[in-house]
Amino acid sequence: MEPSTSTRKHFTINDFEIGRPLGRGKFGRVYLARLKENHFIVALKVLFKSEIEKEGLEHQLRREVEIQAHLQHRNILRLYNYFYDDTRIYLILEYAPGGELYKELQRHQKLDQQRTATIIQELSDALTYCHEKKVIHRDIKPENLLLGLNGEVKISDFGWSVHTPSLRRKTMCGTLDYLPPEMIAQKPYNEMVDLWCIGVLCYELLVGKPPFESSTSSETYRRIRQVDFKFPSSVPAGAQDLISKLLRYHPSERLSLAQVLKHPWVREHSRRVLPC
């Protein structure tokens, strides 16, 4: 029985057996944990209130909780519930035993066509669900993609996400290598920023580094603004076609998520397995 947001129980830290650390960030740590009551395994994200207040991130955290708690999709990490005490905030998250996609990429340096196409298909399906719910992720990158028991992708870290209001957004956020041109130019943007990120991710998974990576941030900015990237010969023609149709300067010229899911290279190489 998962500790769902729909249950009215108020949790405390005493409801959990705490296991090994799974990761650490600027504002706290994530631990493997088990509910004493029914032995349900979770990841417990422990955040320090003082750090969050010092950085003025209360609003961002509230937004992350509000967004992630309402998303239920097999390729999105579940946020089951949350609680807090005088000094800490605890997020009860789905445990993703495969760890970060970033670590898989580091281990193998680059991924093959099948693995990459499968990830792109899973990610595009999850983002279709997000966009239908008027949520833009804005920070898709290997560090924010976790892996389930069978290697399936789970989008995590909705800290930068936004519920899209009717007015298009202008704040710059996300990771430098993955920033789209419209964010660098501080122009209004829409959900097509996530399509740019899918293109960058697909390139990085197949090549082992992002397409606009440079020795200085100003050079990276320049290359993004000019959409200046080249494919190594190792990248298959079908993948080149997909990536080049996603990494377009004008958001309206990028493929839609539906077109990514129908793209011949994705359909031919994806080995996505759906649950029965």
From Swiss-Prot:
Q: Which InterPro entries match?
A: Aur-like (IPR030616), Kinase-like_dom_sf (IPR011009), Prot_kinase_dom (IPR000719), Protein_kinase_ATP_BS (IPR017441), Ser/Thr_kinase_AS (IPR008271)
Q: Where in the cell is it found?
A: Nucleus; Chromosome; Chromosome, Centromere; Cytoplasm, Cytoskeleton, Spindle
Q: The organism sits in which domain of life?
A: Eukaryota
User: Which reactions appear under catalytic activity for this entry?
Assistant: L-seryl-[protein] + ATP = O-phospho-L-seryl-[protein] + ADP + H(+); L-threonyl-[protein] + ATP = O-phospho-L-threonyl-[protein] + ADP + H(+)
Q: SMART domains under this entry?
A: S_TKc (SM00220)
Q: Report activity regulation.
A: Okadaic acid, an inhibitor of protein phosphatase 1 (PP1), protein phosphatase 2A (PP2A) and protein phosphatase 5 (PP5), increases AURKC activity. AURKC is also stabilized through its interaction with INCENP, which also acts as an activator.
Q: What is its main location?
A: nucleus
List the transmembrane segments.
none
Q: Which amino acid positions bind ATP, per UniProt?
A: L22, G23, R24, G25, K26, F27, G28, R29, V30, K45
Subunit architecture: Component of the chromosomal passenger complex (CPC) composed of at least BIRC5/survivin, CDCA8/borealin, INCENP, AURKB or AURKC; predominantly independent AURKB- and AURKC-containing complexes exist; in the complex interacts directly with BIRC5/survivin and INCENP. Interacts with TACC1.
Q: Which PANTHER family match?
A: SERINE/THREONINE-PROTEIN KINASE IAL-RELATED
Protein's name according to its UniProt entry: Aurora kinase C
